[in-house]
Amino acid sequence: MAEKFKVESPHVRYLKDVIEADYNYDTTQVYEEKGVTKVKPCSTKFTFHTERKVPKLGVMLVGWGGNNGTTVTAAVLANRLGLSWMTKTGKKVANYYGSLFQSSTACLGSGPAGDVFVPFRDLLPMVHPNDIVFDGWDISSLNLADAMFRAEVLDWQIQEQLRPYMEKMKPRPSIYIPDFIAANQEDRADHTIHGTKAEQVQKIREDIQDFKRTSDVDKVIVLWTANTERFCDIIPGVNDTADNLLKAIENGLEVSPSTMFAVASILEGCAYINGSPQNTFVPGAIELAVQNNVFIGGDDFKSGQTKIKSVLMDFLVSAGLKPVSIVSYNHLGNNDGKNLSAPQQFRSKEISKSNVVDDMVQSNPILYGPNEKPDHCVVIKYVPYVGDSKRAMDEYTSEIMMGGANTIVLHNTCEDSLLASPIILDLVLLTELCQRITFRTETDQEFQTFHSVLSILSFLCKAPLVPAGTPVINAFFRQRNCIENILRACLGLSPQNHMMLEHKMQRSFVSLKRPSTVCNPQPISSKKGNNANGFHLPGISKGLSQSNGLGKNVINSDIEIEN
């Protein structure tokens, strides 16, 4: 899509092939010296390049014939065709509700009538989901129309309209290793790739090549939306390095199907995203991605109960309340629930859903001591009758002032695949956009890409994959602000800081009415920046921008601001 607006600034240049933007990245270093905590504002000048040409995007789904795969394909077709259908509650029209890029907005700034909001998708040139070309693999041989009927997600009238299109779509055979998924999946596995592990990986590579050739797409992204696998052991000499992982595949040692798909995708230069909770990205797979400069991301779609948890925990801890018990119960009846009824597969999901609160707990040492965290229990049960309409019940108990207790109880009915499908779209759209963004600091000679472990996808994942040694962020609004502010940086715009000083002064702030000039760095509060949701005025000036680097420790000592 072409740009819907242009930034008027000497720091932004719309060149023939790229948008070039100069950007001052303001951070805050905190260190201790002779018993005094020193706080030092820092600024680094970046130059961003964003390619303006939007490619024709192909997406290959592992598990294309499953509930998520059929639903996201049906949704894109219905939107592309402009379909509508009747239900008992009235007429429904195809939409992309639930997609960050298609159905939410970002604030550009303020105008004569107040704040100006634009669709998130309009911040930078992006692929429109209507233009995505789908393909993929499945262990079940059903065409997508029959698989859609089996899934029982969409209303019958829309299924009837889509059947002529979807019955022509048939998944390619997939890799099936019974040991990695529940035994109850065996009756679906009538469409599998035979041969050694090396031959199976080679077949996946040939499938990717064939799809590129026959569909005429410019690039391909591969996404795993198949069954949850059991966890893999990290074994020295098997999957601890890229070379060992490739040798393990050659020698037929233990390598999960999801990791085999990752290896094939990486070797074909295709970004690979893991939408399930298992540890697909063993150290060898990550090293292989880094060596080949290919993006990988995951893990596990953050769609319903866990997304609410990342909001509610952020609220409770930020409000100074102390959650001490979180009990999360689910029951669902789709094939995901059937597979998760096996203990090893459930354990993968339990780990993914349990770690979502860690960064919020660690952010407040006033409430939590070392190694202290809430009791956290996750239960998932398989109830076939409820199908894709997952029920989630949560109880949050928090300690409040003077020994009191506060309990919040939630009941959440999650249409599982209808919540996951827009997340699939956002994952591939954001990954594709990041492939067109490069940047450098003023001391760099060459532009670089993002790290191969694409942590900007964290907003969309239960268990975010991040580069080694970097913080894992689960708090919902911090994750969202990260995406928005990086996209703003590509346009030379200051990050959202929500100060709104122009509305808090007795006399008018005249300088806000003209283009800002370089300001001297101002003292930055020692208080932690708030986690607002990004729907307000942009930063007032680079010198006053809220920095992100005060860290997670509250230190009882004198604080000195260095300018």
Swiss-Prot record:
Example GO BP: phospholipid biosynthetic process
GO cellular component: cytoplasm
Essential cofactor(s): NAD(+)
Pathway the protein contributes to: Polyol metabolism; myo-inositol biosynthesis; myo-inositol from D-glucose 6-phosphate: step 1/2
EC category name: isomerase
Family according to the record: Belongs to the myo-inositol 1-phosphate synthase family.
Reactions it catalyzes: D-glucose 6-phosphate = 1D-myo-inositol 3-phosphate
Protein's UniProt keywords contain Isomerase: yes
Keywords annotated in UniProt: Cytoplasm, Inositol biosynthesis, Isomerase, Lipid biosynthesis, Lipid metabolism, NAD, Phospholipid biosynthesis, Phospholipid metabolism
Subcellular locations according to the entry: Cytoplasm
Protein name: Inositol-3-phosphate synthase 1-A
EC number: 5.5.1.4
Provenance organism: Xenopus laevis (African clawed frog)
Molecular function, one GO term: inositol-3-phosphate synthase activity
InterPro entries listed in its UniProt record: Myo-inos-1-P_Synthase, Myo-inos-1-P_Synthase_GAPDH, NAD(P)-bd_dom_sf
Covalent S-S links between cysteines: none
Residues annotated as transmembrane: none
Main location: cytoplasm
Protein purpose: Key enzyme in myo-inositol biosynthesis pathway that catalyzes the conversion of glucose 6-phosphate to 1-myo-inositol 1-phosphate in a NAD-dependent manner. Rate-limiting enzyme in the synthesis of all inositol-containing compounds.
The keyword Lipid biosynthesis belongs to this UniProt entry's keyword annotation: yes
A Pfam family reported for this protein in Swiss-Prot or TrEMBL: Inos-1-P_synth
